[in-house]
Structures are given as structure tokens and as C-alpha cells.
Amino acid sequence: MAGMKEIRGKIKSVQNTRKITKAMEMVAASKMRRAQERMRAARPYAEKVRAIAAHMSRANPEYRHPFMVANDGVKTAGMILVTTDKGLCGGLNTNVLRASLQKFKELEEQGQKVEATAIGGKGLGFLNRFGAKVISQVVHLGDTPHLDKLIGAVKTQLDLYSEGKLSAVYLAYTRFVNTMKQETVIEQLLPLSSEHFDTNDGTPATSWDYIYEPDAQAVVDELLVRYVEALVYQAVAENMASEQSARMVAMKAASDNAKTVISELQLSYNKSRQAAITKELSEIVGGAAAV
């Protein structure tokens, strides 16, 4: 059995670790609430832009934006991979990276090369180790996603698709469900399908009569770019909310495990102390009997 001094040292070390994980749990809980608020605040904008784009598309069926046209025959696909910059968030990054790797392999089996955009340091490191072609990246977003930081990296993918150099663009991220559950999502961002413009709100699929300045094509072009950017921003906001939730849960589990270890070490310490006292008493009794 280890000595009492050694056990006391272990107890002190685990107690210090538990203080750190407990503090990180509280910080993550605070950041999680703010991240959820940002995530929910971003949804109405994306929904409104989608609704307007749907009405305008029905009002101008003769015009097809490049985002709505499939680039058949192109042997290169795009992938926007959203991960975190930091670790200590459970299996959140591992799950999305594993799913992305599977998607890479599926595309390669179909004869497609992949050009990737990394949002987040963990994804960038993975893509570099994997040997993927990274055409744009953005890292160190902090706790608040800013669209102006994302636009440059995302625009690289959008421009390549508009020029007919990509067959499709996929978006991989972690969707926030609730505090205890997050889902890995890989969805097709481009070309935009009719599903993107389904209202699903019970309203009839009518066309509104708009007055365009300068013209319908220019408005639709700008609107669809804004819509796709909003989808990416929403994915980043969902990923950040998922990150803080996963980190809070992971740090709580670490704190609980530390508490269990401390209890076990305390029990071991008490046994060692009891054995030492018993030994001393035995020696005293033995000495008295000898006299």
C-alpha cells in the first residue's frame, strides 16, 4: 500500500484538477447560453431570405442562377468543413471528422476530387494530415462568429461553383439539438434544390409581384449569395453552440470522475493511517508485555 504522504500528494493533485474542470464547466455553461442565443437569432434572417428567394424564383422561372444549376460532368467537388479551434469538447470534432472522411472516400470512389475549405483549427489540422487540398481557411473565430470573417473563405467555394469548376459543394458541421445531444450533419449546399425553397408553413405557393431595382437578375443574384452565406453562418453558429454544450458536459464528467477518485484515495489514506496506528499500538502493547 502506498505511503500516506504519497496518497496525500495524489489527493491534492486531483483536487486541484477538479477545481480547474469545475471552473471550465461553469465558463462553458455561460458561453453555451450566449451561443444558443446567437444561434436562435440567426435563424429568422435565413428563413426570411429563403422565403423571399422562393417567391422571386417562382415569379421569374425563366432565370436560373448558377447556384440552381447542376454542373454535370465536373470531376471536382467542394467541401466546407466546420469544426472548433479548441479541444476538450468530448467527441464532437471526432464525429464530424470521421463523417467527413467517409464522405471524402465516397466522392473519390465516384471519381471526384475534393477541394476543401476549413473553418476551425481542428478541421484544418485534420485536412492537412489527411493530405486534402485546402483552397481556403479561417481559424481563430473566437466565441462569436462574424460573417465578415467567413465570407472570404466561403466565397472561394461559391465562385468556383459559379464558374462551373465544382460539381457540388457540401457543408459538414455539428447541429445543436439540445444540451445533451448534438448531431453530425453533412448536407449539400450547392446546387440549391427545390427543397431549399419549400415553405412548409401552410401558406400557398403564390408568387409576389415585385418592383426590381436595378433588375430582377441582379436582385436574385445578390439574394441567393446572401442566402448561401446565411446557411454557412447558421452552421457555424450551431457548431459553436454544440461545442460549448459538449465542453460543459465533458468538464462535468471530468469533475464527477475527479470526485470519485478523491473518495477512493481518501479511503486508501484512511486505511493506511489506520494500519499505521494499529502497528504503533501493537508495538506499544508488545513493549509493555516484555517489561
From Swiss-Prot:
In terms of SUPFAM superfamilies, this protein maps to:
ATP synthase (F1-ATPase), gamma subunit (SSF52943)
What the entry lists under CDD domains is as follows:
F1-ATPase_gamma (cd12151)
Report the function annotation for this chain: Produces ATP from ADP in the presence of a proton gradient across the membrane. The gamma chain is believed to be important in regulating ATPase activity and the flow of protons through the CF(0) complex.
Which GO terms fall under molecular function for this chain's record? ATP binding; proton-transporting ATP synthase activity, rotational mechanism
Q: How does it assemble?
A: F-type ATPases have 2 components, CF(1) - the catalytic core - and CF(0) - the membrane proton channel. CF(1) has five subunits: alpha(3), beta(3), gamma(1), delta(1), epsilon(1). CF(0) has three main subunits: a, b and c.
The record, for Gene3D superfamilies, names: 3.40.1380.10, ATP synthase, gamma subunit, helix hairpin domain
Stated membrane topology is: Peripheral membrane protein
Concerning InterPro entries, the annotation shows:
ATP_synth_F1_ATPase_gsu, ATP_synth_F1_gsu, ATP_synth_F1_gsu_CS
Where, per UniProt, does this protein localize? Cell inner membrane
Q: Which UniProt keywords apply?
A: ATP synthesis, Cell inner membrane, Cell membrane, CF(1), Hydrogen ion transport, Ion transport, Membrane, Transport
Alphabetized NCBIfam families for the sequence: ATPsyn_F1gamma (TIGR01146), PRK05621.1-1 (NF004144)
Report any Pfam family annotated for this entry: ATP-synt
- Main localization category: membrane
What family does the Swiss-Prot or TrEMBL record give for this protein? Belongs to the ATPase gamma chain family.
Q: Which GO terms describe its cellular component?
A: plasma membrane; proton-transporting ATP synthase complex
User: Which PROSITE patterns would you find in this protein's record?
Assistant: ATPASE_GAMMA
Organism name: Burkholderia pseudomallei (strain 1106a)
The name on file for this protein is ATP synthase gamma chain
Swiss-Prot/TrEMBL GO biological process terms: proton motive force-driven plasma membrane ATP synthesis
Q: Does the keyword Cell division apply?
A: no
